[in-house]
Amino acid sequence: MAAPVPWACCAVLAAAAAVVYAQRHSPQEAPHVQYERLGSDVTLPCGTANWDAAVTWRVNGTDLAPDLLNGSQLVLHGLELGHSGLYACFHRDSWHLRHQVLLHVGLPPREPVLSCRSNTYPKGFYCSWHLPTPTYIPNTFNVTVLHGSKIMVCEKDPALKNRCHIRYMHLFSTIKYKVSISVSNALGHNATAITFDEFTIVKPDPPENVVARPVPSNPRRLEVTWQTPSTWPDPESFPLKFFLRYRPLILDQWQHVELSDGTAHTITDAYAGKEYIIQVAAKDNEIGTWSDWSVAAHATPWTEEPRHLTTEAQAAETTTSTTSSLAPPPTTKICDPGELGSGGGPSAPFLVSVPITLALAAAAATASSLLI
């Protein structure tokens, strides 16, 4: 009858664990959201618990050291970004959740950087902004555009959250534009503004599809072509001029050419056989500033291909030499018996002709082996 006791103990422990789990994981009120400045000190109270209440603190599910507590309060010194998280205070015995704080560590915003530019003149312009340093917490921006005393609409860019677009209402206006921007977050607020004339912010996008090619039979020429930026809406009414720069990769110094019109140029002073880098910029003929440089194009001037080493004269000379080496040696004349003098006898011509015949046979065999 003693066997059921351990089972009863296990059942009690399991029930207790279930109660604790339910208390620690049961639905609770939304945590209190709190923002604190980077580097500061913060004290987090355990809700309405007494100062001397026995509590345990956790952050993101991990127990915190008891030496961080001042009574039931949690004290954090020199806040760092890593201190951000969900802090929870539990009753030490029952593990009943007393309080939760969602802590965000960050900075107040510094003065924003604001700029405006017209790359679609004369349609309109856009303004963009950013903070010089991150705040690590959410920021809210508010933009106001004035043309004289008239408020203009600044349409949000669908792709870039820190940009908006304004349409020109009156071209060639002498009235200045004023753009103001304010930024705020849970830790502070800041603002800035700029004022400008319409023509001062005109700046096209860089030229597109820059291509450089060698010129056949011209070792010092490169032909460069490009296209007007696709964002420039009316190049006929508002023509662009171009600025071309180029240099060989072996040198650091650029050479420059300014072109009043056209979308092509031939470089005539390139170094033969050296790879070049070429870029082009654009500007309205009358107003505004130069665009940024285009994507770089690379090209090497034309070079003559090396000729074959064997020329026609060398081929003829080689053929003659080969033919001569294969010809048999001159035939040795067989002496007449009468020319041999006395004592030669009838066998003399036979004795003389044997070495000659052998020599001819050897020469023929040599020639045959060479031809094979």
From Swiss-Prot:
Pfam families according to UniProt: fn3 (PF00041)
Membrane topology: Lipid-anchor; GPI-anchor
Domain Ig-like C2-type: start-end pairs: 27-104
Chain positions carrying an annotated carbohydrate: 60, 70, 142, 190
Top-level taxon in the UniProt lineage: Eukaryota
Lipoprotein found in the keyword field: yes
Tissues in which the UniProt entry reports expression: Nervous system and skeletal muscle.
GO molecular function annotation: ciliary neurotrophic factor receptor activity; cytokine binding; interleukin-11 binding; interleukin-11 receptor activity; signaling receptor binding
Lipid-modified residues, GPI-anchor amidated serine kind: 342
Disulfide-bonded cysteines: 46-89
Family that this chain belongs to: Belongs to the type I cytokine receptor family. Type 3 subfamily.
Entry text on domains: The WSXWS motif appears to be necessary for proper protein folding and thereby efficient intracellular transport and cell-surface receptor binding.
PANTHER family: CILIARY NEUROTROPHIC FACTOR RECEPTOR SUBUNIT ALPHA, CYTOKINE RECEPTOR
Binding partners and assembly: Forms a heterotrimer with LIFR and IL6ST. Interacts with heterodimeric neurotropic cytokine composed of CLCF1/CLC and CRLF1/CLF-1. Either alone or in complex with the heterodimer CLCF1-CRLF1 interacts with SORL1; this interaction may promote internalization and lysosomal degradation. Component of a receptor complex composed of IL6ST/GP130, IL27RA/WSX1 and CNTFR which interacts with the neuroprotective peptide humanin.
Function: Binds to CNTF. The alpha subunit provides the receptor specificity. Receptor for heterodimeric neurotropic cytokine composed of CLCF1/CLC and CRLF1/CLF-1. Acts as a receptor for the neuroprotective peptide humanin as part of a complex with IL6ST/GP130 and IL27RA/WSX1.
Name listed for the protein in its UniProt record: Ciliary neurotrophic factor receptor subunit alpha
Lineage: Eukaryota, Metazoa, Chordata, Craniata, Vertebrata
Encoding gene (name): CNTFR
